[in-house]
Amino acid sequence: MSDIVLEELARRLGELTILDVRSRHEFDGSAGKPCDPRQGHIPGARNFDVYRLMELSPEEVHRELNLEPGAEVIAYCHSGSRSAIATQVLRSLGYDARNYVGSWHEWSRHDDLPVA
């Protein structure tokens, strides 16, 4: 499956499972990057740190995500690197995972897009 771009993600915001694979502090906006004009996360996203994702067994990941096998999952981080790793892990576990390459670095620059 291909990466997802800003326009598609914004259009499908309420229907997608979105994983923010940044740290908890980046997710809640208490420790973001100074290059981003806004802090927080994409509304509806669940925080699942990529390092934790890599530490868990496949069974633990399936249990925590609680998604059907083959479910479409979008991963994002700050700039697309951690989410690329998460996407590969999720694909290896049978999910239809897509990377939002622009990630928070792109999303936070669009004042017309919601932030949680």
Describe these PLM feature segments.
Residues 1-17, 21-74, 78-116:
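Rhodanese-like catalytic fold shared by cysteine-dependent sulfurtransferases
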